[in-house]
């Protein structure tokens, strides 16, 4: 039996020798590689924090002491040493262990995360609650240098420093978020990592300046006058010191002894402390060390070779989006592309290679990305800002206030719309229809397949005013991509087939599910109208009302929440017209959706052929057909 099998709770770590800890670290890395190679997951971030996690749990007393993992995708080691070893093979599977901290899983998961830059705010909250309750415990936020580029992190640092809150921030600096970090903070941290001048004292520099013949004394005096600048040159972490934090580091994040020593030191400080830890993303697995971006969030792979297992499949919507945008940008130099630290995930890496001057990765800063795009538009460009649906939630005010209210020509590409699979509820994109369709001047569309996505992107760039375009994470339908692009009439749905008995309205790829269900209904004698809605805003009220009056029965199908979704919009149209004799069945989600394969999630919520047939039965469509035939 190895050492890992004997670790049931963090207290079991405290009696281990350093050679035993080194062996344990190897076992943990092997276990994570084994499980993630089968299930997929965030491998590289976790390989980089093994020693760091062990040190935290040896020095601090979880769950009494609160350890908060920013984003949370680097919490696998934490899960393995906090009593979830036996369930670890179910990581990210349907009904299995979450890939992120979840309060319902363990008392050691004190705060749920999934989006970045929230941990310091949470730590301040826990610390203030502790102080108000007169309790004695430590609060630790672990945040990566990528997440530190998020504005929310600095809001929390500012609050903690101003209030002198007794808490610890561990800056896990691996020089990467998902892709290579960008921005001034990244440059600043890089100087802390690499600049040997931090090891010199102010006196040594002044003495060196004085030795320069003729001008040395004057230079030393100039340096004295510029003491603030010199201080920034000489004192590591001064940015954090100026914000009210005691800065400790940088520390080798793979040196177990050094980590434990610095954490013990941090515990002695009764004011906010920032511990700067240097780690290697992907450490201990050669393929991941060579390509940490690929193994940041990876699907199943061959653990011997590191080769990702890919089945033959059509291109993804994301790939088609990125390629089409490049195609359009070749002809229009005004087209620019913006992303928030996700160039590869949003399909914009090809655009970045072809048009580097027109590509902007603003870091983990969705609010800035959207407002920046609005000003680009008013400056004469055609910005396309691509962000995951779940992260657009962070920029809602900017969408409303900076893009839509002044009618900016911004195309908002909403990637990962609908359920996304194994990453679970923090990453599902199932709220965007609800919060975007209420904006009066926003043209909001969703393609049924990858070819329609091309035409919608082309249409978006021809329109005057803000446009939102939502599409899923999955592969396309495998349809032919037409070369010639055309504009799609705004606010007009596509009637794919007509039938007198029931109307099926789908949005996005759910349209194909409606078509498949219509075939099954036909086998039962039910003739269905199938509508590809295309535009969520403005709605094709004319088509909705026409077929509602004809069939009296409607089923709406959407990969989205029911409340405020497309089905709700259809019912609003019917209500406005007073069509009380039309009955509607809405298929979608009515709760936070768990993790699992997309197909399993769709089936579980009735977004399937079987689900549509059951909805038709609830509408008594079959009984109506049987009644007509017996007359």
Swiss-Prot record:
Thiamine diphosphate binds at residues 73, 114-116, 146-147, 174, 285, 366. It is an enzyme of class 2 (transferase). Binds 1 Mg(2+) ion per subunit. It catalyses: D-glyceraldehyde 3-phosphate + pyruvate + H(+) = 1-deoxy-D-xylulose 5-phosphate + CO2. Mg(2+) binds at residues 145, 174. One of its GO terms (molecular function) is magnesium ion binding. The keyword Metal-binding applies. CDD domains: TPP_DXS (cd02007), TPP_PYR_DXS_TK_like (cd07033). Its cofactor is Mg(2+); thiamine diphosphate. Pfam families: DXP_synthase_N, Transket_pyr, Transketolase_C. Its EC number is 2.2.1.7. Homodimer. Catalyzes the acyloin condensation reaction between C atoms 2 and 3 of pyruvate and glyceraldehyde 3-phosphate to yield 1-deoxy-D-xylulose-5-phosphate (DXP). This is 1-deoxy-D-xylulose-5-phosphate synthase. It comes from Desulfitobacterium hafniense (strain Y51). The lineage of its organism: Bacteria, Bacillati, Bacillota, Clostridia, Eubacteriales. The gene is dxs.
């Amino acid at each position: 039996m190895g050492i890992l099998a004997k670790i049931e709770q963090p207290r079991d770590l405290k009696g281990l020798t350093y050679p035993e800890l080194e062996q344990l670290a190897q076992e943990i890395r092997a276990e994570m590689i084994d499980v993630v190679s089968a299930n997929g997951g965030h491998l590289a971030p976790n390989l980089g924090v093994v020693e760091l996690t062990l040190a935290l749990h040896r020095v601090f007393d979880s769950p009494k002491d609160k350890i908060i993992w920013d984003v949370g995708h680097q919490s696998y080691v934490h899960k393995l040493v906090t009593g979830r070893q036996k369930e670890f093979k179910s990581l990210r599977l349907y009904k299995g262990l979450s890939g992120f901290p979840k309060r319902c899983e363990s008392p050691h998961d004190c705060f749920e995360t999934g989006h970045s830059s929230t941990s310091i705010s949470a730590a301040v909250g826990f610390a203030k609650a502790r102080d108000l309750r007169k309790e004695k415990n430590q609060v630790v936020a672990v945040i990566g240098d990528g997440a530190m580029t998020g504005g929310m992190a600095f809001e929390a640092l500012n609050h903690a420093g101003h209030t002198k809150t007794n808490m610890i921030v561990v800056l896990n600096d691996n020089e990467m978020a998902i892709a290579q970090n960008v921005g001034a903070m990244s440059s600043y941290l890089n100087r802390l990592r690499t600049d040997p001048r931090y090891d010199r004292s102010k006196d040594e520099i002044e003495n060196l300046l004085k030795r320069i013949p003729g001008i040395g004394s004057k230079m030393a005096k100039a340096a004295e006058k510029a003491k603030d600048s010199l201080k920034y040159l000489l004192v590591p972490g001064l940015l954090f010191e100026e914000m009210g934090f005691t800065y400790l580091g940088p520390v080798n994040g793979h040196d177990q002894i050094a980590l434990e020593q610095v954490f013990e030191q941090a515990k002695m400080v009764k004011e906010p402390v920032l511990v700067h830890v240097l780690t290697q993303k992907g450490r201990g697995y050669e393929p991941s060390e060579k390509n940490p971006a690929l193994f940041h969030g990876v699907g199943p792979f061959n653990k011997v070779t590191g080769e990702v297992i890919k089945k033959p499949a059509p291109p993804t919507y994301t790939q088609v989006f990125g390629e089409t945008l490049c195609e359009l940008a070749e002809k229009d130099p005004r087209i620019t592309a913006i992303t928030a630290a996700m160039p590869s995930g949003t399909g914009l890496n090809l655009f970045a290679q072809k048009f580097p001057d027109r590509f902007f990765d603003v870091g983990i800063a969705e609010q800035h990305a959207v407002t920046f795009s609005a000003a680009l538009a008013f400056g004469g460009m055609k910005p396309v800002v691509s962000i995951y649906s779940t992260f657009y939630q962070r920029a809602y005010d900017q969408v409303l206030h900076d893009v839509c209210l002044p009618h900016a020509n911004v195309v908002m590409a909403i990637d990962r719309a609908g359920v996304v699979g194994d990453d679970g509820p923090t990453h599902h994109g199932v709220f965007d229809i609800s919060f975007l369709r209420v904006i009066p001047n926003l043209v909001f569309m969703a393609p049924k397949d990858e070819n329609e996505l091309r035409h919608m992107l082309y249409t978006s760039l021809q329109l005057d005013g803000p446009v939102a375009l939502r599409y899923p994470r999955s592969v396309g339908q495998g349809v032919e991509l037409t070369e010639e692009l055309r504009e799609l009439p705004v606010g007009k749905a596509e009637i794919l087939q007509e039938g007198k008995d029931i109307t099926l309205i789908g949005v996005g790829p759910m349209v194909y599910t409606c078509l498949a269900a219509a075939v099954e209904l036909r086998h039962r004698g039910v003739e269905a109208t199938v509508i590809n809605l295309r535009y969520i805003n403005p709605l094709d009220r004319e088509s909705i009302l026409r077929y509602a009056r004809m069939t009296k029965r409607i089923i709406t199908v959407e990969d989205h929440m029911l409340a405020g979704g497309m089905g709700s919009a259809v019912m609003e149209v019917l209500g406005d017209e007073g069509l009380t004799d039309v009955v509607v069945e809405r298929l979608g989600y009515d709760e936070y959706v768990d993790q699992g394969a997309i197909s399993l999630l769709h089936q579980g919520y009735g977004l399937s052929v079987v689900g549509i047939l059951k909805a038709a039965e609830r509408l008594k469509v079959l009984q109506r057909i049987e009644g007509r035939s017996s007359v």
